């Protein structure tokens, strides 16, 4: 059985005050039935690590990682640096990185491999724009993004978490219906099964990321192939984040 995960992606938001508030909120969270992860901006990883008690079981992650391990790459952050700060996971291929920083599937694959070299678990994002969905190209776009990662082979893919983020539902207030989310998640799992076998595909966690809120989380997480969520704006509210975590518990 796949253990649910709720991962908070603060994006370029937050403050030291929020770090402290979140630390207090998560101090007593029960992670026995659901994995809880928070990905703050890079400067807040250290403070959040100190604010959240080690015994809580809450994990920390980065929002991005360099495809390079070290060198003259101003502004980049290496996987080993994230690991040294206590991160266990890192988001790779988020739609905002793909769109705003022109990250190609090739770059995403390089970052996946860089994260794994550092001992991090990549959360690999795939998803389609509104134009692609309206054109009936959801499976074509998501399949292409997914295939680039699946080609790395089962030994790599079994170490990943996938996240489906319909770009048209990120920060827009629009949310994929549970039926829409389940349909794409089922497609992703079947694509993985076709490439690498059903046993691996059934173990592969697939998160949903697209305007998940306390009010819709339970219904979305109730879908057969949805294994939790990659939470954006709602992860900035400690009380709301706790509600979403509660909704993910089996």
From Swiss-Prot:
One of its GO terms (molecular function) is triose-phosphate isomerase activity. The lineage of its organism: Bacteria, Pseudomonadati, Pseudomonadota, Gammaproteobacteria, Chromatiales. InterPro entries: Aldolase_TIM, TIM_sf, TrioseP_Isoase_bac/euk, Triosephosphate_isomerase, Triosephosphate_isomerase_AS. Transmembrane segments: none annotated. Substrate binds at residues 9-11, 171, 211, 232-233. PROSITE patterns: TIM_1 (PS00171), TIM_2 (PS51440). This is Triosephosphate isomerase. The keyword Nucleotide-binding does not apply. It is found in: Cytoplasm.
């Amino acid at each position: 059985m796949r253990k649910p995960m709720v991962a908070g992606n603060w994006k370029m938001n937050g403050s030291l005050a929020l770090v402290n508030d979140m630390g207090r909120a998560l101090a007593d969270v029960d992670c026995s039935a659901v994995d809880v992860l928070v990905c703050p901006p890079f400067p807040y990883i250290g403070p959040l690590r100190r604010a959240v008690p080690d015994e809580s079981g809450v994990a920390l992650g980065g929002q991005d990682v360099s495809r390079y391990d070290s060198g003259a790459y101003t502004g980049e952050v290496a996987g080993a640096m994230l690991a040294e700060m206590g991160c266990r996971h890192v988001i790779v291929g988020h739609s905002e990185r793909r769109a705003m920083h022109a990250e190609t599937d090739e770059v995403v694959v390089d970052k996946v491999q860089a994260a794994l070299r550092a001992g991090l678990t990549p959360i690999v994002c795939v998803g389609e724009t509104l134009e692609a969905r309206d054109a009936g190209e959801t499976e074509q776009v998501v399949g292409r993004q997914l295939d680039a990662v699946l080609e790395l082979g089962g030994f790599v893919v079994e170490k990943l978490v996938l996240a489906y983020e319909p770009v048209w539902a990120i920060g827009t207030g629009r949310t994929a219906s549970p039926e829409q989310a389940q349909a794409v998640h089922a497609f992703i799992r079947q694509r993985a099964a076709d490439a690498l076998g059903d046993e691996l595909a059934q173990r592969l966690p697939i998160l949903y990321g697209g305007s998940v809120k306390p009010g819709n989380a339970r219904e979305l997480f109730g879908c057969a192939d949805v294994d939790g969520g990659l939470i954006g704006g709602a992860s900035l509210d400690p009380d709301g984040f706790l509600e979403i975590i509660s909704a993910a518990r089996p």
